């Protein structure tokens, strides 16, 4: 049986863009969401392997935005 491999892209968190639009500090956002500034930094830099839907909802509430405002899908380069 032949194996099929599908190249996947990546999900980018545009938290820094929303922070600038809202004139908010990373530490303030972390406090509103209820996570440590270190964990918020992991999300912001794209080093997180997963994010809970509840955390995404809290981010949207704190930033007054929709998930699509902070998430972006980039296709894998071929």
Would you name each region that the model predicts?
Residues 1-24:
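A short, Lys/Arg-rich alpha-helix, primarily the initiator
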Residues 16, 27, 57:
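Residues within the helices of the helix-turn-helix
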Residues 19, 30, 60:
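The alpha-helix within a helix-turn-helix
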Residues 39-42, 55, 69:
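Residue-level recognition of specific faces of alpha-helices
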Residues 24-42:
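Short alpha-helical DNA-recognition segment
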Residues 20, 34, 45, 75:
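Residue-level detection of the helix-turn-helix DNA-binding "recognition helix"
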Residues 64-78:
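Short C-terminal boundary/hinge segments that cap the last helix of small helical domains
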Residues 47-58:
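Short, basic-rich loop-to-helix N-cap that marks the start of a DNA-contacting helix
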């Amino acid at each position: 049986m032949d194996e099929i491999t599908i190249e996947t892209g990546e999900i980018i968190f545009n938290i820094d863009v929303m922070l600038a639009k809202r004139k908010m500090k990373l530490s303030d956002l972390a406090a509103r969401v209820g996570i440590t500034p270190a964990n918020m930094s992991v999300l912001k830099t794209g080093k997180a392997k997963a994010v809970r839907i509840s955390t995404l909802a809290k981010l949207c509430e704190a930033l007054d935005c929709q998930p699509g405002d902070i998430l972006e899908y980039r296709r894998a380069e071929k």
